[in-house]
UniProtKB/Swiss-Prot annotation:
Top-level taxonomic group: Eukaryota
InterPro entries attached to this UniProt entry: WD40/YVTN_repeat-like_dom_sf, WD40_repeat_CS, WD40_repeat_dom_sf, WD40_rpt, WD_repeat_EMAP
Oxidoreductase listed as a keyword: no
Localisation per UniProt entry: Cytoplasm; Cytoplasm, Cytoskeleton, Cilium axoneme; Cytoplasm, Cytoskeleton, Flagellum axoneme
A Pfam family: WD40
SMART domains per the UniProt record, alphabetical: WD40
Oligomeric and partner information: Microtubule inner protein component of sperm flagellar doublet microtubules. Interacts with BRCA2. Interacts with the CCT chaperonin complex. Interacts with HSP70. Interacts with AK8. Interacts with CFAP45. Interacts with DNAI1. Interacts with IQDC.
Name listed for the protein in its UniProt record: Cilia- and flagella-associated protein 52
Length: 620
């Protein structure tokens, strides 16, 4: 992960309109603001603030790497977020002003990673926990924006502390817990020291995943990897009770919340959400969700709450009927491809591990999900008539689905030996051109009932990364990671022209007038080529720091867009070869991008599962 290199100032900025994404792997990453109107959650190196009712989004940019924890002060004035960084480098904590949506202070002491953060009940202090390479706990003064004191978080002969919870009534007491360690800390402000007391659990050895403090500080609760809950008394530092004795929570207690009315909300690693009470901890109410639960956050007193899972689902649950409503979802693995149907910008499809999803462009809603378990989809295309979605899968099959229902229409088995890596369709809807991991390009004839292999074109020596078809369906171009682009004659089914370069080609586009193509790849250069004889016209320096993975050109051919490992979306003038606009917002490597039909939006997708929609900067 390179740090983001901000572009020079003379280039205009692209306007980011919307983000579809949520990093569900961050423990307690989903937070409901005390005003009960906003959700706050991390995505890559940004923190998103989303209005619950209107879905309006604000973005907090400032971290140079992935956000690893987020917390909100009791009154809701401050947000604090911590990040991961490279081994030996300092990891920043950023303090944000919620109302102004801006950075107040950057606190850096910890190395490698910030494991957890917590505000004191009167917003006086912030306590932070460093990652495994750091192992320290630090108390910060919010007024002075400076560290008060620090200490090693755990003893010498136990594991790392991974979670921290502040007292609900006193600003001087907090609890840290982790692998074999549970400590209650007292802050001694005059001497600038924190004093730990080790809590005794007797013969029991547990790894703590989640913590929760009762409203009156009478007890705190610890969820463990074993799947049981420990109830501790912070005054006596002794174990009060533990449970459930039988039927422990599968895959551990990964999230825990205490309710004002008594009782606990418990989320397990297997996706089970439970309401239970001490000392039996037997389920009083329960509901099964999709993906291991990583966050439970209350809206107000807990009459309604939000749950975030590892599979990047955000659910709203009402306490009384304990029924879940899915309010937001996105891909939880790298998004491989994005495509618009012919002639409409109202919806688009993306594909990733396990599934293909169809989205409504304006409302960011998921309209359809097509799931194929344990497989990864490398590429998708809509047939021109809109009657099927053609997809390329890593098990070597080409699958076609109905776009309204998601029903499997047909499968082409064993289409390629080492997985299907690229796919394209002709505008007459009669042919599919596919590329495989072994380098073959295959032309398939598709009828109502039959799918027949017309020709296998064997020229490439390595996987095919991109296929584009000419408007008249008589020619196509394929880009490969063996350093060649080949222009094929689709009538006589043989090679017309070959382009060689010292790079792994990742993307290729026809200029709309179709006498030139542009290519790019791992050498960071954008090259213009003559289709007729395969000669290079010119080369541009496409990026400063990494491979270019995605490219698309407008219908008129005046501008094109690129994106890649530098996390920047760039808009280029085709004839001048100059960057006109740059979009900063991605925090993972950009995998693919498309300009919508009608040139309204640019949609880019990245390796952290995010889908970003940008306003196209020129009037069409």
């Amino acid at each position: 992960m390179e740090e983001q290199v901000l572009p020079e100032l003379d280039v205009a900025e692209l306007e980011l309109q919307a983000v579809i994404g949520f990093n569900g792997h961050v423990p307690n990453g989903l937070k409901c603001h005390p005003d009960q109107e906003h959700l706050i959650y991390p995505l890559g190196c940004t923190v998103l603030i989303q209005a619950i009712n209107t879905n309006e989004q604000n973005f907090l940019h400032g971290h140079g790497n992935n956000v690893s924890c987020v917390t909100i002060s009791k009154e809701g004035d401050y947000i604090a977020s911590g990040q991961v960084t490279f081994m030996g480098f300092k990891a920043d904590i950023i303090l944000w002003d919620f109302k102004k949506r801006e950075l107040i202070a950057r606190l850096s002491l910890h190395k490698g990673k910030i494991e957890a953060l917590a505000f004191s009940p009167n917003d006086l202090y912030l306590v932070s926990l460093g990652g495994p390479d750091d192992g320290s706990v630090v108390v910060w003064s919010i007024a002075k924006r400076d560290a008060i004191c620090g200490s090693p978080a755990a003893g010498l002969n136990v594991g790392n502390a991974t979670s921290v919870v502040f007292s609900r009534c006193r600003d001087e007491m907090f609890v840290t817990a982790g692998n074999g360690t549970i400590r209650v800390w007292e802050l001694d402000l005059p001497n600038r020291k924190i004093w730990p007391t080790e809590c005794q659990t007797g013969q029991m050895k547990r790894i703590v995943l989640s913590t929760g403090m009762a409203d009156d500080d009478s007890f705190f609760y610890l969820g463990t990897t074993t799947g049981d809950i420990l109830k501790m008394n912070p005054k006596t530092k002794l174990l009060a009770d533990t449970g459930p004795v039988k039927d422990k929570f599968s895959l551990g207690v990964s999230a825990l919340r205490c309710l004002k009315m008594g009782g606990l909300l418990v989320g397990s690693g297997a996706g089970l959400l439970i309401f239970c009470k001490s000392p039996s901890y037997k389920p009083i109410k329960k509901v099964q969700l999709q993906g291991g639960i990583t966050s439970i956050t209350l809206r107000g007193e807990g009459h309604q709450f939000f749950v975030g899972t590892e599979e990047s689902h955000i659910y709203r649950v009402n306490f009384t009927d304990f029924k879940e409503t899915l309010i937001a979802t996105c891909h939880f693995e790298a998004v491989q491809d994005i495509v618009f149907p012919f002639g409409t910008a109202e919806l688009f499809a993306t594909c990733a591990k396990k599934d293909i999803r169809v989205w409504h462009t304006m409302s960011k809603r998921e309209l359809l999900r097509i799931t194929v378990p344990n497989m990864t989809c490398h590429g998708i295309d809509f047939m021109r008539d809109g009657k099927s979605i053609i997809s390329a899968w890593d098990d070597g099959k080409i699958r076609a689905f109905a776009p309204e229902s998601g029903r499997l229409m047909y499968t082409i088995n064993s289409a390629h030996r080492i997985g299907v890596t690229a796919i394209a369709t002709t505008s007459d809807c009669k042919r599919i051109i596919s590329g495989g991991g072994e380098g073959e390009v295959r032309v398939w004839q598709v009828g109502c009932q039959t799918q027949k292999l017309e020709e296998a074109l064997k020229e490439h020596k390595s996987s095919v990364s991109c296929i584009r078809v000419k408007k008249n369906n008589e020619e196509c171009v394929t880009a490969s990671t063996d350093g060649t682009c080949i222009i094929w004659d689709l009538v006589r089914l043989r090679r017309n022209q070959m382009i060689l370069a010292n790079t792994l080609f990742q993307c290729v586009c026809y200029h709309p007038e179709e006498f030139q193509i542009i290519t790019s790849g791992t050498d960071r250069k954008i090259a213009y080529w003559e289709v007729f004889d395969g000669s290079v016209i010119r080369e541009l320096e496409g990026s400063l720091s990494g491979s270019i993975n995605g490219m698309d050109i407008t219908q008129e051919g005046g501008h094109f867009v690129t994106g890649g490992h530098d996390h920047l979306v760039k808009v280029w003038d085709y004839n001048e070869g100059e960057v006109t606009h740059v979009g900063v917002g991605h925090s993972g490597n950009i995998m693919a991008m498309r300009i919508s039909p009608g040139n309204q939006y640019i949609v880019s997708v990245s390796a952290d599962g995010a889908i970003l929609r940008w306003k196209y900067p020129f009037a069409s």
